Each structure stands twice: as structure tokens, then as C-alpha cells.
């Protein structure tokens, strides 16, 4: 009878979450790249979901130099720290993040138009 009660307490998925801590920071979350229309033909590109392990100000500096655009880090009440760049930089950001190894292709979610 005690053997049967032991079966009830066995959880086959108890160890399923082990090993997740071996993944690099931010791999379980998506990086969202959005575009927002401003006045006229002007647009803003926002990048949200980059792990806190990375210095966002240094990333903005690299984006500004590589893409020849202006950018800043803003504090969004819902999304936390968000990188904001002038112009439509969605493809450039995707290529750059994959190139430097910050994200994989399946982690990037591109929104807009």
C-alpha cells in the first residue's frame, strides 16, 4: 500500500525546469522591435526586451554610429527601459543584434506596417 502512495507523490515534470539557468541572459524572452509613425513621413523605431545585463546606453551609442541616426533610452511605465531611434531602423537592428550575438533570429519580433 505504501508503494501506491509513493506513486501519487511522484512528479515526472519536477526536473523539467532544471538546466534553464545555463542559457545566456535574455534567451527566454523576445526582443520586440516596433515602428511608430510621427508627423508626416517621420518614424521612430523602438527596441524593447533587451536583457538588463547589457548597458543600453552603450548599445544606443553603437546604433547611432552604425546607422547614422539619433537615439536615446527612455523609461516606459509598462515596458521598462526602451531604446528609441529615429527613422525606420528595423532591418538594421535585426542584423546588428544577430551579428554581435546579442539575440538569435527566432528571438526577434518585428512589429509595424
UniProtKB/Swiss-Prot annotation:
Assigned GO CC terms: cytoplasm
What is the annotated localization of this protein? Answer: Cytoplasm
User: Recorded GO terms, molecular function?
Assistant: translation initiation factor activity
The record's Gene Ontology biological-process terms are:
positive regulation of mRNA cis splicing, via spliceosome
Q: Where is this site: Binds 40S ribosomal subunit?
A: 41, 65
**Cytoplasm listed as a keyword:** yes
Which coarse location class applies to the principal site listed for this UniProt protein? Answer: cytoplasm
- Any S-S bridges, and between which cysteines? none
> Is Protein biosynthesis there in the keyword field?
yes
Q: Which residues carry this modification: N-acetylserine?
A: 2
Give the family per the record. Belongs to the SUI1 family.
* Biological role: Component of the 43S pre-initiation complex (43S PIC), which binds to the mRNA cap-proximal region, scans mRNA 5'-untranslated region, and locates the initiation codon. Together with eIF1A (EIF1AX), EIF1 facilitates scanning and is essential for start codon recognition on the basis of AUG nucleotide context and location relative to the 5'-cap.
Summarize subunit and interaction data from the UniProt record for this chain: Component of the 43S pre-initiation complex (43S PIC), which is composed of the 40S ribosomal subunit, EIF1, eIF1A (EIF1AX), eIF3 complex, EIF5 and eIF2-GTP-initiator tRNA complex (eIF2 ternary complex). Interacts with EIF4G1; in specific 5'-UTR length and AUG context. Interacts with EIF5; which in a mutual exclusive interaction associates either with EIF1 or with EIF2S2 on a common binding site. Interacts with RENT2.
Q: Which PANTHER family match?
A: EUKARYOTIC TRANSLATION INITIATION FACTOR SUI1
Under which name does UniProt file this protein? Eukaryotic translation initiation factor 1
Species: Mus musculus
The gene that this protein is the product of is: Eif1
Amino acid at each position: 500500500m505504501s508503494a501506491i502512495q509513493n506513486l501519487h507523490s511522484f512528479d515526472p515534470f519536477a526536473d523539467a525546469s532544471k538546466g534553464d539557468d545555463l542559457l545566456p541572459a535574455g534567451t527566454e524572452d523576445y526582443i520586440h522591435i516596433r515602428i511608430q509613425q510621427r508627423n508626416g513621413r517621420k518614424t521612430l523605431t523602438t527596441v524593447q526586451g533587451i536583457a538588463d545585463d547589457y548597458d543600453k546606453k552603450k548599445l544606443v551609442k553603437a546604433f547611432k554610429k552604425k546607422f547614422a541616426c539619433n537615439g536615446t533610452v527612455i523609461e516606459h511605465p509598462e515596458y521598462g527601459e526602451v531604446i528609441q531611434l529615429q527613422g525606420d531602423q528595423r532591418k538594421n537592428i535585426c542584423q546588428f543584434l544577430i551579428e554581435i550575438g546579442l539575440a538569435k533570429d527566432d528571438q526577434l519580433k518585428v512589429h509595424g506596417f
